[in-house]
Structure formats: C-alpha cells, structure tokens
Swiss-Prot record:
Family: Belongs to the PsbL family.
Protein name: Photosystem II reaction center protein L
Organism of origin: Aethionema cordifolium (Lebanon stonecress)
Subcellular location: Plastid, Chloroplast thylakoid membrane
Chain ranges passing through the membrane: 17-37
Binding partners and assembly: PSII is composed of 1 copy each of membrane proteins PsbA, PsbB, PsbC, PsbD, PsbE, PsbF, PsbH, PsbI, PsbJ, PsbK, PsbL, PsbM, PsbT, PsbX, PsbY, PsbZ, Psb30/Ycf12, at least 3 peripheral proteins of the oxygen-evolving complex and a large number of cofactors. It forms dimeric complexes.
GO cellular component: chloroplast thylakoid membrane; photosystem II reaction center
GO terms, biological process: photosynthesis
Functional description taken from the UniProt entry: One of the components of the core complex of photosystem II (PSII). PSII is a light-driven water:plastoquinone oxidoreductase that uses light energy to abstract electrons from H(2)O, generating O(2) and a proton gradient subsequently used for ATP formation. It consists of a core antenna complex that captures photons, and an electron transfer chain that converts photonic excitation into a charge separation. This subunit is found at the monomer-monomer interface and is required for correct PSII assembly and/or dimerization.
Gene that this polypeptide is encoded by: psbL
Length: 38
C-alpha cells in the first residue's frame, strides 16, 4: 500500500479520459461535417 500506486492510476485515468475525449470530439467532428456537407 504505497502512495505511488494510486497516483499512477490517477495519471493513467486522466490520460485515458483525455484520449477518449479527443476521440469523441474527432468522431463528433466527422459526424457534423458529414451532416453539413450532405
């Protein structure tokens, strides 16, 4: 039970959430571009 483990997990969670956020924005941008162009 060291304090480095939860800190590392929090960093990984922040990175994964950031990647998922960017992916979601990317997909939404594609959907909106397809909607406007069509």
């Amino acid at each position: 039970m060291t304090q480095s483990n939860p800190n590392e997990q929090n960093v990984e969670l922040n990175r994964t959430s950031l990647y998922w956020g960017l992916l979601l924005i990317f997909v939404l941008a594609i959907l909106f571009s397809n909607y406007f162009f069509n």
